[in-house]
């Protein structure tokens, strides 16, 4: 299993790209550019809210698991 890092606004790179692609696949309006910007923040916030994930609006271990259904 891959250990995904916790991501927050301002982060950049491959894992942000993967998170954006997963959000896009699930129907959220987000650019896949590898930059955790305000649009990514809004999409992630909506995803977390719709899946009853409490806490900070970061992409953490719980969020990754729900994104990938494992």
Language-model region placement:
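Acidic, Ser/Thr/Pro/Gly-enriched interdomain connector segments
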Residues: 1-34
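Sec-exported extracytoplasmic/periplasmic mature domains
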Residues: 24-28, 49-53, 64, 68-69
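Conserved hydrophobic/aromatic packing and binding residues within compact polymer-binding modules
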Residues: 44
């Amino acid at each position: 299993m891959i250990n995904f890092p916790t991501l927050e606004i301002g982060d950049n790179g491959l894992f942000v790209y993967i998170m954006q692609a997963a959000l896009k696949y699930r129907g959220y309006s987000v650019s896949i550019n590898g930059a955790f910007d305000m649009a990514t923040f809004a999409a992630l916030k909506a995803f977390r809210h719709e899946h009853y994930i409490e806490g900070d609006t970061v992409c953490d271990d719980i969020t990754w698991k729900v994104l990938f259904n494992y």
